[in-house]
Protein backbone atom coordinates (compact mmCIF):
# COMPACT_ATOMS: atom_id res chain seq x y z
CA UNK A 1 0.00 0.00 0.00
CA UNK A 2 3.00 2.31 0.23
CA UNK A 3 2.52 5.31 -2.05
CA UNK A 4 -1.05 4.31 -2.94
CA UNK A 5 -3.87 6.83 -3.35
CA UNK A 6 -7.31 5.85 -2.06
CA UNK A 7 -10.10 7.50 -4.04
CA UNK A 8 -12.66 4.73 -3.59
CA UNK A 9 -12.33 1.52 -1.62
CA UNK A 10 -12.10 -0.29 -4.94
CA UNK A 11 -8.51 0.96 -4.81
CA UNK A 12 -7.93 -1.53 -1.98
CA UNK A 13 -8.27 -5.29 -2.12
CA UNK A 14 -10.49 -7.06 0.40
CA UNK A 15 -7.29 -8.29 2.00
CA UNK A 16 -6.01 -4.73 2.39
CA UNK A 17 -9.31 -3.59 3.90
CA UNK A 18 -9.12 -6.47 6.37
CA UNK A 19 -5.56 -5.41 7.16
CA UNK A 20 -6.77 -1.87 7.90
CA UNK A 21 -9.40 -3.23 10.28
CA UNK A 22 -6.75 -5.34 12.00
CA UNK A 23 -4.34 -2.39 12.25
CA UNK A 24 -7.01 -0.13 13.73
CA UNK A 25 -7.71 -2.68 16.47
CA UNK A 26 -3.99 -2.85 17.24
CA UNK A 27 -3.66 0.94 17.32
CA UNK A 28 -6.58 1.24 19.74
CA UNK A 29 -4.87 -1.02 22.27
CA UNK A 30 -1.33 0.31 21.68
CA UNK A 31 -1.76 4.11 21.67
CA UNK A 32 1.58 4.84 23.38
CA UNK A 33 3.53 2.36 21.28
CA UNK A 34 2.42 3.93 17.98
CA UNK A 35 2.73 7.56 19.08
CA UNK A 36 5.98 8.15 17.15
CA UNK A 37 5.22 6.04 14.07
CA UNK A 38 4.96 8.99 11.66
CA UNK A 39 7.48 11.36 13.20
CA UNK A 40 8.80 13.68 10.52
CA UNK A 41 5.76 13.15 8.27
CA UNK A 42 3.40 15.93 7.21
CA UNK A 43 -0.26 15.56 6.20
CA UNK A 44 -2.07 18.20 4.14
CA UNK A 45 -5.82 18.53 4.68
CA UNK A 46 -7.26 20.37 1.68
CA UNK A 47 -10.93 20.89 2.48
CA UNK A 48 -12.82 22.86 -0.16
CA UNK A 49 -16.08 22.03 1.62
CA UNK A 50 -17.13 22.41 5.29
CA UNK A 51 -16.28 19.55 7.63
CA UNK A 52 -15.89 19.02 11.35
CA UNK A 53 -15.46 15.31 12.06
CA UNK A 54 -13.66 14.24 8.91
CA UNK A 55 -11.08 17.03 8.89
CA UNK A 56 -10.39 16.87 12.62
CA UNK A 57 -10.25 13.07 12.43
CA UNK A 58 -7.65 13.10 9.64
CA UNK A 59 -5.60 15.70 11.49
CA UNK A 60 -5.86 14.00 14.88
CA UNK A 61 -4.87 10.69 13.29
CA UNK A 62 -1.59 12.12 12.01
CA UNK A 63 -0.91 14.01 15.24
CA UNK A 64 -1.46 10.86 17.32
CA UNK A 65 1.05 9.08 15.09
CA UNK A 66 3.64 11.77 15.79
CA UNK A 67 3.35 13.68 12.51
CA UNK A 68 2.33 17.23 11.67
CA UNK A 69 -0.51 18.81 9.70
CA UNK A 70 -0.92 21.74 7.31
CA UNK A 71 -3.92 22.72 5.21
CA UNK A 72 -7.02 24.83 4.87
CA UNK A 73 -10.71 24.51 5.73
CA UNK A 74 -12.86 26.25 3.15
CA UNK A 75 -12.32 27.13 -0.49
CA UNK A 76 -12.34 30.83 0.40
CA UNK A 77 -9.01 30.30 2.17
CA UNK A 78 -7.30 28.72 -0.85
CA UNK A 79 -5.84 30.05 -4.10
CA UNK A 80 -8.84 28.60 -5.93
CA UNK A 81 -10.37 32.03 -5.28
CA UNK A 82 -7.63 33.39 -7.56
CA UNK A 83 -8.42 30.85 -10.25
CA UNK A 84 -5.88 28.14 -9.38
CA UNK A 85 -6.81 24.64 -10.54
CA UNK A 86 -6.92 21.58 -8.29
CA UNK A 87 -4.09 20.07 -10.32
CA UNK A 88 -1.81 23.05 -9.75
CA UNK A 89 -2.64 23.12 -6.05
CA UNK A 90 -1.76 19.44 -5.70
CA UNK A 91 1.46 19.76 -7.66
CA UNK A 92 2.45 22.56 -5.30
CA UNK A 93 1.37 20.94 -2.04
CA UNK A 94 3.08 17.66 -2.99
CA UNK A 95 6.39 19.45 -2.48
CA UNK A 96 5.54 20.13 1.16
CA UNK A 97 3.95 16.94 2.45
CA UNK A 98 3.96 13.14 2.51
CA UNK A 99 0.21 12.55 2.10
CA UNK A 100 -2.88 14.60 1.21
CA UNK A 101 -6.50 14.30 2.36
CA UNK A 102 -8.87 16.23 0.10
CA UNK A 103 -12.58 17.05 0.30
CA UNK A 104 -14.30 18.78 -2.59
CA UNK A 105 -17.94 19.43 -3.60
CA UNK A 106 -17.38 18.17 -7.16
CA UNK A 107 -17.53 14.48 -7.98
CA UNK A 108 -14.24 13.27 -9.42
CA UNK A 109 -12.15 16.04 -7.86
CA UNK A 110 -10.21 13.59 -5.70
CA UNK A 111 -9.28 11.54 -8.75
CA UNK A 112 -8.02 14.66 -10.53
CA UNK A 113 -6.01 15.51 -7.42
CA UNK A 114 -4.44 12.04 -7.23
CA UNK A 115 -3.32 12.20 -10.85
CA UNK A 116 -1.63 15.55 -10.30
CA UNK A 117 -0.01 14.76 -6.95
CA UNK A 118 3.35 13.08 -6.44
CA UNK A 119 2.32 11.80 -2.99
CA UNK A 120 -0.62 9.59 -1.92
CA UNK A 121 -4.03 11.27 -1.97
CA UNK A 122 -6.91 10.11 0.23
CA UNK A 123 -10.45 11.05 -0.75
CA UNK A 124 -12.20 12.70 2.20
CA UNK A 125 -15.44 13.02 0.21
CA UNK A 126 -16.10 14.24 -3.33
CA UNK A 127 -19.59 15.63 -3.87
CA UNK A 128 -22.26 12.93 -3.81
CA UNK A 129 -19.81 10.31 -5.07
CA UNK A 130 -17.69 8.47 -2.50
CA UNK A 131 -16.39 8.75 1.07
CA UNK A 132 -14.03 5.78 1.50
CA UNK A 133 -12.66 6.57 4.95
CA UNK A 134 -16.17 6.94 6.38
CA UNK A 135 -16.86 3.47 4.99
CA UNK A 136 -13.77 2.16 6.78
CA UNK A 137 -15.20 3.62 10.00
CA UNK A 138 -18.54 1.97 9.25
CA UNK A 139 -16.90 -1.41 8.62
CA UNK A 140 -14.91 -1.14 11.85
CA UNK A 141 -18.13 -0.42 13.74
CA UNK A 142 -19.90 -3.42 12.20
CA UNK A 143 -16.88 -5.60 13.01
CA UNK A 144 -16.92 -4.34 16.60
CA UNK A 145 -20.67 -4.84 17.06
CA UNK A 146 -21.20 -8.13 15.21
CA UNK A 147 -17.76 -9.66 14.76
CA UNK A 148 -18.35 -9.64 11.00
CA UNK A 149 -19.33 -7.44 8.07
CA UNK A 150 -21.29 -10.11 6.18
CA UNK A 151 -24.51 -12.08 6.74
CA UNK A 152 -26.33 -8.92 7.77
CA UNK A 153 -29.54 -7.15 6.86
CA UNK A 154 -28.59 -3.51 6.47
CA UNK A 155 -31.19 -0.75 6.23
CA UNK A 156 -30.12 2.58 4.77
CA UNK A 157 -32.54 5.40 5.43
CA UNK A 158 -33.00 8.97 4.25
CA UNK A 159 -31.02 10.64 1.49
CA UNK A 160 -29.87 7.76 -0.68
CA UNK A 161 -29.42 9.92 -3.79
CA UNK A 162 -26.77 12.38 -2.64
CA UNK A 163 -25.45 10.39 0.33
CA UNK A 164 -21.87 9.54 -0.64
CA UNK A 165 -21.42 7.53 2.56
CA UNK A 166 -24.33 5.32 1.52
CA UNK A 167 -22.89 4.72 -1.94
CA UNK A 168 -19.45 3.87 -0.56
CA UNK A 169 -20.83 1.49 2.06
CA UNK A 170 -23.11 -0.39 -0.33
CA UNK A 171 -20.40 -0.87 -2.93
CA UNK A 172 -17.90 -2.11 -0.36
CA UNK A 173 -20.30 -4.46 1.42
CA UNK A 174 -21.13 -5.96 -1.98
CA UNK A 175 -17.48 -6.91 -2.33
CA UNK A 176 -17.62 -8.80 0.96
CA UNK A 177 -20.96 -10.35 -0.06
CA UNK A 178 -23.92 -11.93 1.74
CA UNK A 179 -25.70 -8.69 2.62
CA UNK A 180 -29.39 -7.91 2.25
CA UNK A 181 -29.95 -4.19 1.74
CA UNK A 182 -33.21 -2.47 2.65
CA UNK A 183 -33.25 0.95 0.97
CA UNK A 184 -35.62 3.32 2.77
CA UNK A 185 -36.28 6.67 1.11
CA UNK A 186 -38.89 8.88 -0.55
CA UNK A 187 -39.09 8.68 -4.33
CA UNK A 188 -37.14 11.94 -4.67
CA UNK A 189 -34.11 10.54 -2.81
CA UNK A 190 -33.85 6.98 -4.11
CA UNK A 191 -30.60 5.11 -4.59
CA UNK A 192 -28.86 5.87 -7.92
CA UNK A 193 -29.09 3.19 -10.58
CA UNK A 194 -25.34 2.64 -10.74
CA UNK A 195 -25.37 1.64 -7.06
CA UNK A 196 -28.33 -0.70 -7.61
CA UNK A 197 -26.46 -2.20 -10.55
CA UNK A 198 -23.58 -3.00 -8.21
CA UNK A 199 -25.94 -4.90 -5.90
CA UNK A 200 -27.54 -6.73 -8.83
CA UNK A 201 -24.11 -7.77 -10.07
CA UNK A 202 -23.35 -9.43 -6.73
CA UNK A 203 -24.97 -12.86 -6.60
CA UNK A 204 -24.96 -13.11 -2.80
CA UNK A 205 -26.49 -9.64 -2.23
CA UNK A 206 -30.04 -8.37 -2.69
CA UNK A 207 -32.06 -5.24 -2.07
CA UNK A 208 -35.58 -4.02 -1.39
CA UNK A 209 -36.76 -0.44 -1.83
CA UNK A 210 -39.40 0.82 0.62
CA UNK A 211 -40.76 4.14 1.86
CA UNK A 212 -41.86 3.22 5.39
CA UNK A 213 -39.20 2.74 8.08
CA UNK A 214 -41.46 1.25 10.75
CA UNK A 215 -42.61 -1.57 8.47
CA UNK A 216 -39.06 -2.92 8.10
CA UNK A 217 -37.13 -1.82 11.19
CA UNK A 218 -37.80 -5.10 12.99
CA UNK A 219 -35.98 -7.03 10.26
CA UNK A 220 -32.77 -5.02 10.40
CA UNK A 221 -29.43 -5.87 11.97
CA UNK A 222 -28.13 -2.42 11.06
CA UNK A 223 -29.98 0.85 10.52
CA UNK A 224 -27.82 3.44 8.76
CA UNK A 225 -29.53 6.81 9.13
CA UNK A 226 -28.59 9.83 7.00
CA UNK A 227 -29.58 13.48 7.02
CA UNK A 228 -31.29 15.13 4.09
CA UNK A 229 -28.48 17.36 2.84
CA UNK A 230 -29.63 20.94 2.35
CA UNK A 231 -26.43 21.82 0.46
CA UNK A 232 -27.26 19.32 -2.31
CA UNK A 233 -30.65 20.87 -3.14
CA UNK A 234 -31.18 23.54 -5.77
CA UNK A 235 -34.72 24.23 -4.54
CA UNK A 236 -35.10 25.00 -0.83
CA UNK A 237 -38.81 24.15 -0.92
CA UNK A 238 -37.91 20.57 -1.89
CA UNK A 239 -35.50 20.37 1.03
CA UNK A 240 -38.05 21.70 3.52
CA UNK A 241 -40.64 19.23 2.24
CA UNK A 242 -38.33 16.21 2.60
CA UNK A 243 -36.11 16.94 5.60
CA UNK A 244 -38.47 15.51 8.24
CA UNK A 245 -39.50 12.39 6.31
CA UNK A 246 -37.67 10.03 8.67
CA UNK A 247 -37.09 10.71 12.35
CA UNK A 248 -35.82 7.84 14.50
CA UNK A 249 -37.11 8.05 18.06
CA UNK A 250 -37.75 5.77 21.05
CA UNK A 251 -41.15 4.77 19.71
CA UNK A 252 -39.66 3.42 16.48
CA UNK A 253 -36.73 1.82 18.32
CA UNK A 254 -39.26 -0.25 20.26
CA UNK A 255 -39.92 -2.23 17.06
CA UNK A 256 -36.23 -2.97 16.44
CA UNK A 257 -34.13 -5.97 17.40
CA UNK A 258 -32.46 -5.84 20.80
CA UNK A 259 -29.02 -6.08 19.19
CA UNK A 260 -29.61 -3.84 16.18
CA UNK A 261 -26.93 -1.19 15.62
CA UNK A 262 -27.86 2.36 14.62
CA UNK A 263 -25.19 4.08 12.54
CA UNK A 264 -25.02 7.62 11.18
CA UNK A 265 -22.11 9.34 9.40
CA UNK A 266 -22.95 12.63 11.15
CA UNK A 267 -23.66 15.47 11.37
CA UNK A 268 -27.27 14.86 12.23
CA UNK A 269 -29.98 17.47 12.18
CA UNK A 270 -33.16 15.96 13.62
CA UNK A 271 -33.33 12.54 11.93
CA UNK A 272 -32.25 10.81 15.16
CA UNK A 273 -33.90 12.11 18.32
CA UNK A 274 -31.46 12.92 21.13
CA UNK A 275 -33.33 10.45 23.33
CA UNK A 276 -31.89 7.61 21.22
CA UNK A 277 -28.31 8.54 22.18
CA UNK A 278 -28.57 6.65 25.48
CA UNK A 279 -29.87 3.49 23.81
CA UNK A 280 -27.10 0.83 23.76
CA UNK A 281 -27.95 0.22 20.11
CA UNK A 282 -26.78 3.74 19.19
CA UNK A 283 -23.36 3.29 17.57
CA UNK A 284 -22.84 6.62 15.80
CA UNK A 285 -20.41 8.15 18.30
CA UNK A 286 -18.54 4.85 18.31
CA UNK A 287 -18.18 5.38 14.55
CA UNK A 288 -16.38 8.67 15.23
CA UNK A 289 -13.70 6.94 17.28
CA UNK A 290 -13.39 4.15 14.73
CA UNK A 291 -12.98 6.73 11.97
CA UNK A 292 -9.92 8.18 13.66
CA UNK A 293 -8.41 4.74 14.23
CA UNK A 294 -8.99 3.69 10.62
CA UNK A 295 -7.42 6.92 9.36
CA UNK A 296 -4.41 6.29 11.58
CA UNK A 297 -4.11 2.84 10.02
CA UNK A 298 -4.51 4.19 6.49
CA UNK A 299 -2.18 7.17 6.83
CA UNK A 300 0.65 5.11 8.31
CA UNK A 301 0.19 2.49 5.59
CA UNK A 302 0.29 4.77 2.55
CA UNK A 303 3.41 6.59 3.77
CA UNK A 304 5.09 3.26 4.56
CA UNK A 305 5.65 3.65 8.30
CA UNK A 306 5.44 0.41 10.28
CA UNK A 307 3.63 0.30 13.60
CA UNK A 308 6.01 -0.88 16.37
CA UNK A 309 5.15 -4.43 17.44
CA UNK A 310 2.41 -4.88 14.87
CA UNK A 311 2.04 -8.28 13.21
CA UNK A 312 0.18 -8.32 9.86
CA UNK A 313 -2.73 -10.64 9.19
CA UNK A 314 -1.57 -14.14 8.32
CA UNK A 315 -4.64 -15.11 6.26
CA UNK A 316 -4.34 -15.60 2.51
CA UNK A 317 -5.42 -12.67 0.36
CA UNK A 318 -9.05 -12.68 -0.75
CA UNK A 319 -9.51 -11.67 -4.37
CA UNK A 320 -12.00 -8.86 -4.99
Swiss-Prot record:
GO terms for molecular function: amino acid binding; aspartate carbamoyltransferase activity. Pfam families: OTCace, OTCace_N. SUPFAM superfamilies: Aspartate/ornithine carbamoyltransferase. It catalyses: carbamoyl phosphate + L-aspartate = N-carbamoyl-L-aspartate + phosphate + H(+). Disulfide bonds: none annotated. Its EC number is 2.1.3.2. Pathway: Pyrimidine metabolism; UMP biosynthesis via de novo pathway; (S)-dihydroorotate from bicarbonate: step 2/3. Heterododecamer (2C3:3R2) of six catalytic PyrB chains organized as two trimers (C3), and six regulatory PyrI chains organized as three dimers (R2). Catalyzes the condensation of carbamoyl phosphate and aspartate to form carbamoyl aspartate and inorganic phosphate, the committed step in the de novo pyrimidine nucleotide biosynthesis pathway. Belongs to the aspartate/ornithine carbamoyltransferase superfamily. ATCase family. This is Aspartate carbamoyltransferase catalytic subunit. The gene is pyrB.
Amino acid sequence: MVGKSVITLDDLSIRQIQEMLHKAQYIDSHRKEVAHTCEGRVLATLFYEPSTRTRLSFETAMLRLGGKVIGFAGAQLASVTKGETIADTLKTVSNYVDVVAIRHPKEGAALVASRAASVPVINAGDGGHMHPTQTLADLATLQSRFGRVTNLTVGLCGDLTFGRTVHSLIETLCRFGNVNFVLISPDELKTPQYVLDRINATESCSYTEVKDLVSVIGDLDVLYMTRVQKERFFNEDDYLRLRDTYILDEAKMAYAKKDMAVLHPLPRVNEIAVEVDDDPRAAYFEQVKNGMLMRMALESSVVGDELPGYEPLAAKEVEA
